[in-house]
Structure formats: C-alpha cells, structure tokens
Curated annotation (Swiss-Prot):
Mg(2+) binds at D461, D463, D465. The keyword Nucleotidyltransferase applies. It comes from Thermodesulfovibrio yellowstonii (strain ATCC 51303 / DSM 11347 / YP87). Zn(2+) 2 binds at C803, C877, C884, C887. This is DNA-directed RNA polymerase subunit beta'.
C-alpha cells in the first residue's frame, strides 16, 4: 500500500535522464495540476506556537510536514507511518523536504495580465492585439474601455474608449455593442484571435507593402503570431486566473533571537495579493458599486505585477527600509540571482583556503599542505584507514582518535595523502592554468607552500595572496587531476604555445650572474681538457665563476666561462653548447626551455626546471646582488645636454615669435626636443653606469664595470625593472602626462637620486594617481570582457576529426611600417595546411595538405622562400555545432594535434580575456612618464638592396628631389634575386631622396617628411590666385599675440563657399594639371595658408599646411576599449567614409553643405557626400581600392562586410585585435581570435525567404539556413536569399540557440519571455546549459565519445564505497 502511495509523488529527476528542456506558457490547468492546494489566508505562522497557519502561506496540509515523518499535531511520528494522511490535521506523513518542491495556488477573483508579456519590449500582448503598450496599459489598469464586439454599430473592434466616450456610446447604442476594461476584456479579445487567419493576412500585407518600415513592423507582428502558432501556446494564457505559489522552503521565514522573524520579500508580496484578492471577493459578494470593485481589481492587478516583476513597474514597491522588494524576476536575474549565484557558482565541499608562502625546496609537482588542513580535508579517508589498520572498529571511534590527534592518525594521514592529488586554485581564475593539481606534502604551520615556478601561471606572489585547495574524491576525478591537471603537464600556455613555466626574478638573476664573463677574474685564460676538470678547479677555488677559459668539448676547444660549464651540468645531454654559451637572460632561458621541451619532451624539461630553480636561487644568494645608491650613477654630461635642449626650446620659441610656425607645431617640436634629450641622457647614463667618483676608467673597463652594476644586472637579465625605470632613477624622469593624456611640455629634469622639487613632485602625482584609478576601473572592464567572450564561445567544442572542407584562409607575414612584426613561421605554427606546398624553385612537394605545421616544417617552408600560404581555419570549418580537429590545428598547450572534446571556445575566450586583465593592471609601472613615440619623419633602409617605386605619383623639384603626390605610394627594397625584402609606405608630401633602381646600403636615408603637418602641394608651377577667401566667413587672420605676425587660417565655412588656391599660367588663365583637370586646390577647415595672392610657385611647393593633432600618450587604456569596440562590432563614432568600388577619385563641387567626391569605376560610379570640416585623405586623380577610406577616421566593420565580404572582414578583425595586444607585447595565437570571430559571424539575415519557412529580416544560424535551403531545393522550391551578419559578442551570446545559456548571461526576463512564447527547446549542447542543469559537461572527458569509458579501480588501493549514507547510519 505505502509503495503505491509513494509512487504517486514525483521523484526528483536524475539530470542524466533527460536530453533537452523546454520552456512554455503554463495553462491554468497546468498550474492547478502542479498545486497541492489553494492558499486562502495571508497568515504565515502562529506567533505563539510557531506552527504554520492552516490554509496560510506556510500551511503544512498543502506544502507538507515541517519535521521529517511527523504530522503537525504529532499524532503520527516515525517512518512506519510513511504516506499516511493524519485525520486530525490533514498533514501527510512524509519527508519535510517536499516543502521545497510542492506548490500551492491562489484562485483570483478577477483575471490579471502577466506583466512580462505586457511590459516587455516589444510588448507581446500589444503585438498580438496590434495595440500600443500605452493603450494596452490603460485598458488593463481600468482607465479606458476597449470594444470587444462592435455588433452593428459604427465602432470597430479594439477601439479604445474613455469613460465619457463609453457613456456616450451606451446612451446612443444601448447594449448593441460589447466593451469592457481590465484583463477580462483583453482575454476575450485574445481568445477571439484566429492565429492562422491573422498570419495569412499579415503575409499578404507584407508582400504588398512598399516601404521597408511597414514591412519591418508587420514582420515583427508576424513573428509573434507564428511563435504562438508553432508552439502550441494559447494567447489567452498570458492572462492569469490563478497564481502559482512558490514552495515555502524557497521563500523561508526564519526566526531570529528576540522573537522577530526574517522573512523573504516574496511572502510580503504574496500576502498583498491574497489580501486584495479576498477583499475583492468580499466586495463582489456584497455587490459593491462598480467604481469600488474596479479600483480593487486594479489594485489586484498591480499586486500581481509586483509579485512577478517589481523592477518593470514605474514605481517599484518599497519595503519599510526604502529598498525595493525582491520579486520573482529579481530572484533569477543578475549576479545575485538564481542563475549566477546558485547554478553557475556553487560552493564546494572538501575545500579549504589559506595564505601561500614560497616553497623552493619542493619539486614542481608538489605543494605543501598544512597538517591541520590536510587532516580536515581527508577526514573520511583517514577514518577508513584507521579502521582498515585496526586502530578503530567503528567510525565513531575513529572520529574520537582524530579529535585526540593521536600519532597513528598522522601516520594514517601520510598514507592517505600518498598519490592523492589535490587541486589548488587562485582567484581570479582568468585562464585554465588558474587551477592545477599537485601532490600534497605535509608541512607544519598554517600556510600552503607553492612552487615558485608555477607562480606565473597562477599570477601569484607572496605578499599575502590566498589560495583554495579542493580534494578530488572519486577515482575518475583523481585520474583526471593526475593526467590532465598536474602542474608538470601544463608547461605551455594555451594562448600561444610558449612555455609558461619560465624562471622569474631571483632565479633569472642567479643564472644570469652565473653565465656572465669578467676578463680579470681569477683563473682567466686557463685551458682545460674537459668540463670535469673545470668543476674540480672551481671547487678547489683555483678559478672564479666569471673567468673566461678554454675547454675541450667534443674534440674542439671552446671559449667559455666557468659559470657556463657549471650551468651545462644541469642541462640535458644533447643540447648544443652554443645555446648556453652566452649571458642567459630571461628571454634566452625561455628559448632554452622551449628547445628542451620540443626536442627532449616533458620529463626532461621538468627535471631540468627543478634543477634550474635550485641552482638559480643558490647562485643569486651567493652573488650578494643588492641595490645601493651609488649604483645609480648620474651621467656627467647631463647638465650640458639639458642646457643644449633648453637652447633648442628657446630657438623654437623664437621661430614661433616670428610667426614661422604655429602654436601646434611649436608644442609638438618642444615635446620632441625633450623626448629626444631624455633618450640621450638615458644613453649617456647607460654608458657611465659603472663609473665611480674621482676614478678614471677606459671605455672597456667602464663597460665591464657597468655589466656588473647591480641595478643594471637586474634590468638586463629581465629579473625586475626596465631601462626606463633606471632612466628615472639616474637619468631624468622626462616628460609627464596630464590626467587627460596630454603631455606637459616642461619635463622633469631631475631624477629620483637627486630628488624632485615640490613642483616636479606635484606634476608626478598626476600620473601616479591616474595609474591607480585606471587599474581599479579597468580590472572590472577586463573581467566583463572575459565574461562576454566566454559566453559567446562556450558552446564550441571539437566534435570531429575532419569536416572535409577545401576552404581555408591565406596567411602572410605581418608587416607594419616596413617592419615585420610577426614573421610567417610564427603565424603558421600549429596550423593545418589547406593545400600541398611546393618549393617555388624546384617544384618538389614540401608538405601535403592536412599536415599540421610544427616548428621544423614552419622553418622549412619559410626557408624555401614561400611568403603566402593557404591554411585551414575555424573561420571556414563546416562542422555544425562545433569545429573539426583539422581546421583547428594543434593544441598549443600540448603541442600535438587537438583531441576531440576539447572546449576550444572557452580556451579562446580565456586566452583573449586573461591578458586583458593583466594589461590593465600594468598601466602605472612607469608612473605616468610619457612614453611618446617620437614621430618618425625619416625613412631609412634596414638592409641593403635595390630601390623600386610602387604606384608612386610624384613631381620633381628644382633640387632634384621627388615629392610624393598620392597616398598608398610605396618604396620597396629588393635583394639580388628580385625578392622583396622591405616595404615602406610613404605619406603624401614626402620628399624622396633616392632614385628608382639605385642601390642603397643599410641605414641610408630614403625619404623624409614633416611629422607635424600634412601639406597641400602644387603639381605645377605658376602664379597664385585665391578664391572665396572672405575674412570672417571662410578664413580669419590670426595675429599671434607673442609675435605680432599674422597668417590666414581657414575656418568652418558655409556650404556656399569654396575657399581655394588656384594656379594661373602666363596668360592669367587657370592652369591645367597633367590629368587635365583645372589646377584648383580646395582648402579644408583648419588649413593654414603658406602662400599669398600673386606669389610665384614651383612644382612641389607647399601651398598650405594642415596641422596634425597634438600628441597623446599611447597606452592600453586606448587598448581595452578598442578591443571591446571591435568584439562588440560597434560603429565607430567618427567612422570613415569608405569607397565601395575600385576606381579613380574625382572632386565634384559641393551640394547641401557637403563636398561631393565621385569614384569612377570601370562600369559604375559612386558619389559620396563628405561633411565639411572633415579631412579628405585622397586626392583628385588617385586610384582607390574598394574598402579604402576617403576621409580620416576608424573604419566601420559593417561596411567592410558589405563592400569586401566576410573573408576580408575576418582578416580585418583578427589583425586589428592583434594590433592592440601586440602593442603591449602580449602574444596570442590568431586561432583564438578566429574562434570568437566565427561566433560573431554565425548568423545570416534573410533578404528573401523564397519557399522556406523563414521571414524577411529573420536572423538565422548559417548552418540552419544552408540546411533549410537544401531541403527546399530538393523539393524543387525557390531557396531563400540572405546576407552575412556581423553581431557583437553580447548580441551573439544572447542570440544563441540555447535559452538557458542566454538567460544566465544578460537580460534574463526578456530571454525567458521570448523563449516561453516560442516554446523553445534547449538541446543542452553547450557547457553552461549543462552546468546549470547539473549534468556532466559535454567537453573533455564528458564528451559523448567517451560516454562508455570506465575506470578500473585496481590502480587505487583506497575504497570509497565504504562511505555511503547507510554505513554511517548503521554505525
């Protein structure tokens, strides 16, 4: 009998038992089905007995008993009465936890509208009824009447009538028509809607509509109608007759001491609903006047609104404490809501946290665990061990032993801990290396010991950081921890494949000191027969570490030092000696570790790292390097350099006073002078670092003394500090920036050793404070960026080996400003070839398609002279719901092909987000010293070769130099075989000093230009005439107050004017340019005229100058917002106008206050209106490519997509994002950015639905679109047409297929409302959905591929089964 009753109750679903989850509107029948009884009274619990009031909000009869297996009145106790319903109090005898899942309901006296569907944007109810939210609300809140059935009156259905109009109609038509107010009236209208007919009508209207605005509006409505039609939801379910009541345990009432109660806000909200509902019932029974009833109904509607969503209402209901009450919606949304607080961020049992201290004596796979902590964490295991060994017979006894901390307990703990890894985590966990597994070693004290080499990965230091420890319990968890998460298995960074376990600080300093050379050290010049002899001599103190010696290695003599031979002892055999026969800085050590890892494997690397750490610390200790004030030597030439600079500044000031230069130019020049002098002082300081007062040294001696200067060694080895910081200590601090980013033109000439004057100190504080303020703000921003990135990419895994696509992307070396910033071999490392590669000279195949490129192959490809490769990429991968292994390439963290199930989306997001946080924390290290990049105004050849010109349009000046007259002009330097070696862009107006075909040496000047102004240059000679120059309208005479000289500056002028400089020929006619157009040069606002009427000019002369903006300092502050802007695909504020076709530029007058630029292509012409005052960067007669900007400004990514297509856009986004990171010296592999870009471009917008079920303007997943089209074509129908879409990451994350994931990200209520109306099914494909549902995530070892893998328990001696609940109860 009891079994049958027990089976009536729903058992909690096992998360593995279902594969998808659907959300839809609840019908009134469904709500009644959920409910265990009606809540009729607003009372909660009896204040004297503390027992719940019957029929109240905590009623035990409805929701279940308060104590396990016990009814309320106490007639039935114990488990034997399971399932009995008490005849006295009506409570069922069952576990009290049913109070967490049993719901009640409230029968409403009048229907109410659900606020989510009324108030959401766009309002769902409004769209269905074709009413505005305003009208709808007036009806629902009983202000206006709505016509339900017009009968045979001239009224129309859904007409809105005010109180007076309604009375008028009643007197006119009597009861021929039907109108009503409130949710009842709305429900009747919703019931009348025939979805099929309305949908058909709308489709016809959309076909007939002419304007896109109307089409869009109708489509919006059609979408909602279709959603209701396809989902099986009825529109009238948006109006509620019955309100479900949450189980009482989820809205608890907790007694505090002192007889007061802490209650969940929901209880107050429910109480108001019940009170008003009961009052309304009573009023209706008493047949109260309609006004009173109407008011009560409105109040009921409002109270239900507040219960469901208190934030959507204009006036949120406040508690007594003036804070808004937390409604049901507030419970689920936001950081403190159900999703993010309880489902995605659970607390974990078997965990502890403590301060970390350094443990240099540990091996790399170990961590020190405090004894007391370990005992607590491994308690169950210790109990088991004590029983096993016979020290205790029951758990209770074992407990007692542990509490007494007897000696056998510690022995048991030692044994338990053997081979049982623990996880260490340091918050914030910015990438997956923030949690790693270690073998615990018991230590005294209360601090966790951490190996110094893993600090980089955790970003930990020992200034009070804390870390958390977690214990993996099951065999499976232990195996995963050991195989996948062990610190020795994570030597490479997933972001770029470089070693992340690189020695830092002291270790670097020690190794660097060990490998230095000192020519007068003891034993210098000695010759040894083998390394053993050297070590013996060193141990006998016959030679010093730094002595340069000769040693016979592999049969030949090598010049080296004693220290390097000592270092050779710890390096694996087989590493070429030349790799370590040099001063080993941090960078060199990184290369060495990478080499060892690549050639000798993980095991040797770890052994080497362990030895390296011990040796580094040892030597650093012996060296006795420290900082002393005399180490900061102030250069003797400093005063004279500063005097010289002051003289130059005076000269610039004089030129300004005479009116030769403008204020802006003066400022820029002064900044430049000081930036240069700071550099020179720094150079002098570096030269003289080793000097002592009153002693003379030869330059050679000085160089050696300098190389042993403590501060120099710290910076040079890469241990701590930089040359820039030494400069501030001993050179001069240099230019500082204001908080706004402008540079203050008086620099700080003092350094920290001399000390600063109060004024200098005050100027310094700007930068220092801004640095600290920025850090705080930007950490939050970077964290938010990471969160958005993870959310957009969390459902991308590796699903299959090969998607079979033939597509790929082309990759070349990245060149910026003539310099290769990223060589080809770095860019192709870890990628898969998309086609066979042939040697350009011999034609033999170097590698077949689908080969993964490792370091050796990358080198081979580059050496063969190939400079452009087609590789496979995630951007072109055809795998649905994921990516294939071939397109992704190598798993950078393990340098082998990536495995199926790898969560590459999350790895990509972490790789991009983690340095964002890092960078933002690093803005203030130079204390705001302005690091202005000295404007490059001279171009020098880097190597030797032959000069070639590439699309240069120029005129020759009298002196034989050439002046460039177009943009995208280039100078190329080729080697003897005609291969391009260097490539330089030239700016408009640059002066070329070399001739085409000339052979140049490295360092030779090629061209120069003015870095501060953009000139306007004449192409022909002649006499100057000015047009439309009206003072005060198109230009103003600016008289410089300091100089008394005047010049003409063009100002923002009315559209009818076109100020210009015209060149006249001998006859006084307007001369013609070689292209045939008239020689007129339009002057933009801000231009400063250099010529005057009647002047005679030669070809190549400057007519006017446009000053460039004054310089601001560059810093990732510009960087992080820039990265966010690119990922969010925002349209830039000052977007450049871009040419849509290839063609020749023509200037054509102006219209409506804008200049008109025409681009003439081969078969089409495009006109562009340029707003006045914008600086045009193309010139008449220039040839522009599609996608090139015509005016200054950032390019709008959406226009790249439209003009150049998706491939170009993808390349642009990847390159632009990489640029920002590269500026900060952060290396991220392209593939990570590609993964995110793939997600941003996964949707298409339907332009023409054809015969498919799509609607115009629908945003559909690319794969679904292709699939649907294939089906339609197979049926012989017309396929849909669509254009690719670029979504920002926030929008892409919200438009994911999974509603659970989207709701837990942002805008929870909107996502849930939309999903419920469509009755969306979540297939639980991504990580987040599965974490929320409490399932194993479908990535890594949880992948469907490994579903049936079992782990054999024999490897582990421990038996965990001992700890099921029953065994504890029995004892």
């Amino acid at each position: 009998m009891t079994e049958d009753i027990y089976s009536l109750f729903q058992k909690p679903k096992n998360p593995r038992d279902f594969d998808a989850i659907r959300i839809k509107l609840a019908s009134p029948e469904k709500i009644r089905e959920w409910s265990y009884g009606e809540v009729k009274k607003p009372e909660t619990i009896n204040y004297r007995t503390f027992k719940p009031e019957p029929e109240g909000l905590f009623c035990a009869k409805i929701f279940g008993p308060i104590k396990d297996w016990e009814c309320l009145c106490g007639k039935y106790k114990r488990m034997k009465h399971k399932g009995v319903i008490c005849d006295k109090c009506g409570v069922e005898v069952i576990q009290s936890k049913v109070r967490r899942e049993r719901m009640g309901h409230i029968e409403l006296a009048a229907p109410v509208a659900h606020i989510w569907f009324v108030r959401g944007v766009p309002s769902k109810m409004g769209l269905l009824l074709d009413l505005s939210v305003r009208q709808l609300e007036r009806v629902i809140y009983y202000e206006d009447y709505i016509v339900i059935d017009p009968g045979d009156t001239p009224l129309k259905e859904k007409d809105i009538l005010t109180e007076d109009e309604y009375k008028k109609c009643i007197s006119q038509y009597g009861n021929k028509f039907k109108a009503g107010m409130g949710a009842e009236a709305v429900r009747e209208l919703l019931k009348k809607i025939d979805l099929d007919i309305v949908a058909q009508e709308l489709k016809e209207k959309i076909e007939a509509a002419t304007s896109t605005g109307i089409k869009r509006k109708l489509t919006k409505r059609l979408k909602v109608i279709e959603a209701f039609k396809n989902s099986g939801n009825r529109p009238e379910w948006m109006i509620l007759d019955i309100v479900p009541v949450l189980p009482p345990e989820l809205r608890p009432l907790v007694p505090l001491d002192g007889g007061r109660f802490a209650s969940s806000d929901l209880n107050d909200l429910y109480r108001r609903v019940i009170n008003r509902n009961n009052r309304l019932k009573r009023l209706m029974e008493l047949k109260a006047p309609s006004v009173i009833i109407r008011n009560e109904k409105r109040m009921l509607q409002e109270s239900v609104d507040t219960l469901f969503d208190n934030t959507k209402r204009s006036k949120a209901l406040k508690a007594g404490t003036r804070r808004p009450l937390k409604s049901l919606s507030d419970m689920i949304k936001g950081k403190q809501g159900r999703f993010r607080q309880n489902l995605l961020g659970k607390r974990v049992d078997y965990s502890g946290r403590s301060v970390i201290v350094v443990g240099p004596e540990l091996d790399m796979h170990q961590c020190g665990l405090p004894k007391s902590m370990a005992l607590e964490l491994f308690k169950p295991f210790v109990f088991n061990k004590l029983e096993e060994k016979g020290y205790a017979t029951t758990i209770k006894q074992a407990k007692r032993l542990v509490e007494q901390e007897r000696s056998e307990v510690w022995d048991a703990l030692e044994e338990v801990i053997q081979e049982h890894p623990v996880l260490l985590n340091r918050a914030p966990t910015l990438h997956r290396l923030g949690i790693q597994a270690f073998d615990p070693v018991l230590v005294e004290g209360k601090a966790i010991k951490l190996h110094p080499l893993v600090c980089t990965a955790f970003n930990a230091d020992f200034d009070g950081d804390q870390m958390a420890v977690h214990v993996p319990l099951s065999y499976e968890a232990q195996v995963e921890a050991r195989v996948l998460m062990m610190s020795v298995g994570n030597l490479l960074s997933p972001a770029n494949g470089k070693p992340i376990v690189v020695p830092t600080q002291d270790m670097v300093l020690g190794i660097y000191y060990l490998t230095k050379e000192k020519h007068d050290a003891k034993g210098a010049g000695k010759v040894f027969s083998d390394p053993e002899e050297v070590i013996l001599a060193y141990q006998c103190k016959a030679v010093e570490k730094h002595a340069p010696i000769k040693v016979k290695l592999n049969g030949e003599f090598v010049n080296t030092t004693v220290g390097r031979i000592l270092f050779r002892e710890i390096v694996p055999e087989g590493v070429p000696f030349q790799m370590i026969n040099k001063e080993l800085t941090k960078k060199e050590l990184g290369k060495l570790i990478e080499y060892i890892h690549y050639n000798f494997g993980k095991r040797d690397t770890v052994l080497f790292l362990n030895k390296l750490e011990k040796l580094g610390f040892e030597v650093a200790t012996q060296s006795g390097i420290s900082i002393c004030i005399d180490d900061m030597h102030i250069p003797s030439k400093k005063t004279e350099l500063i005097k010289e600079a002051e003289a130059q500044v005076m000269e610039v000031q004089r030129q300004y006073a005479e009116g030769l230069i403008t204020q802006g130019e003066r400022y820029n020049k002064v900044i430049d002078i000081w930036a240069n002098v700071t550099e020179r002082v720094a150079d002098e300081m570096m030269k003289e670092l080793g000097a002592e007062r009153g002693k003379e040294f030869t330059p050679e001696e000085l160089a050696e003394r300098r190389s042993f200067n403590s501060i120099f060694m710290m910076a040079d080895s890469g241990a701590r500090g930089s040359i820039a910081q030494i400069r501030q200590l001993a050179g001069m601090r240099g230019l500082m920036a204001k908080p706004s980013g402008e540079i203050i033109e008086t620099p700080i000439t003092a350094n920290f050793r001399e000390g600063l004057t109060p004024l200098q100190y005050f100027i310094s504080t700007h930068g220092a404070r801004k640095g600290l303020a920025d850090t705080a703000l930007k950490t939050a921003n970077a964290g938010y960026l990471t969160r958005r990135l993870v959310d957009v990419a969390q459902d991308i895994f590796l699903i299959e080996h090969d998607c079979g696509t033939k597509d790929g992307i082309y990759i070349t070396a990245l060149i910026e400003g003539g310099e290769i910033v990223m060589p080809l071999e770095e860019r192709i490392y870890g990628r898969t070839l998309a086609e066979d590669i042939k040697d350009p000279l011999t034609g033999e195949i170097i590698a077949k398609r689908d080969t993964v490129i490792d370091q050796a192959l990358a080198k081979k490809i580059v050496d063969s002279g190939i400079d452009r490769l087609k590789i496979r990429s995630v951007l072109t991968c055809r795998t649905k719901f994921g990516v294939c292994s071939k397109c992704y390439g190598m798993d950078l963290a393990r340098s082998e092909p990536v495995e199926i199930g790898e969560a590459i989306g999350v790895i990509a997001a972490q790789s991009i987000g983690e340095p964002g946080t890092q960078l933002t924390m690093r803005t203030f290290h130079i204390g705001g010293a302005a690091t202005k990049i000295v404007e490059q105004a001279v171009l020098e050849a880097k190597g030797s070769g032959t000069v070639r010109f590439k699309n240069i349009h120029y005129v020759e000046r009298k002196d034989g130099s050439l002046v460039v007259l177009n943009r995208n002009a280039m100078i190329v330097i080729t080697d003897s075989s005609g291969r391009e070696r260097e490539k330089y862009n030239l700016v408009y107006g640059a002066k070329i000093i070399v001739k085409e075909g000339q052979i140049v040496e490295s360092g030779q000047r090629l061209a120069e230009w003015d870095a501060y102004t953009t000139p306007i240059i004449t192409e022909i000679g002649g006499k100057i005439a000015l047009g439309d120059m009206v003072e005060g309208v198109t230009f103003k005479e600016e008289t410089d107050p300091t100089t008394g000289l005047s010049h003409k500056i063009i100002i923002d002028y009315p559209a009818t004017y076109r100020p210009r400089v015209t060149i006249k020929d001998k006859d006084g006619k307007t001369a013609k340019l070689p292209s045939g157009t008239a020689a007129r040069y339009l002057l933009p606002a801000g231009a400063i005229l250099v010529v005057d009427k009647g002047d005679i000019v030669e070809p190549g002369d400057i007519l006017a100058k446009i000053p460039r903006e004054t310089i601001k300092t560059k810093d990732i502050t510009g960087g992080l917002p820039r990265v966010a802007e690119l990922f969010e695909a925002r349209r830039p504020r000052e977007a450049a106008i871009v040419s849509e076709i290839d063609g020749i530029v023509e200037f054509k007058g102006s219209q409506k206050g804008s200049r008109v630029i025409v681009v003439r292509g081969a078969d089409e012409t495009r006109e562009y209106l340029i707003p006045k005052g914008k600086h045009v960067i193309v010139h008449d007669g220039d040839w522009v490519k599609a996608g090139e900007p015509l005016i200054d400004g950032s390019i709008n990514p959406h226009s790249i997509l439209e003009i150049l297509g998706p491939t170009e856009l993808q390349r642009y986004l990847v390159d632009e994002i990489q640029k920002v990171y590269r500026l900060q010296g952060v290396s991220i592999h392209d593939k990570h950015i590609e993964v995110i870009v793939r997600q941003m471009m996964k949707k298409v917008r339907i332009e023409d639905p054809g015969d498919t079920s799509f609607l115009i303007g629908d945003e559909v997943d690319r794969f679904i679109f292709i699939e649907e089209n294939e089906k339609v074509i197979a049926r012989g129908g017309r396929p849909a047409q669509a254009r690719p879409l670029l979504l920002g990451i926030t929008k892409a994350a919200l438009s994911t297929e999974s509603w659970v994931s989207a709701a837990s990200f942002q805008e929870t209520t909107r996502v849930l409302t939309d999903a419920a109306i469509e009755a969306r099914i979540d297939e639980l494909r991504g990580l987040k959905e599965n974490v929320i549902m409490g399932r194993i995530i479908p990535a890594g070892t949880g992948s469907p591929v490994y579903k049936d893998t079992l782990i054999k328990g024999e490897f582990y001696s421990m038996q965990i089964e001992h700890f099921s609940e029953e065994s504890i109860e029995e004892n």
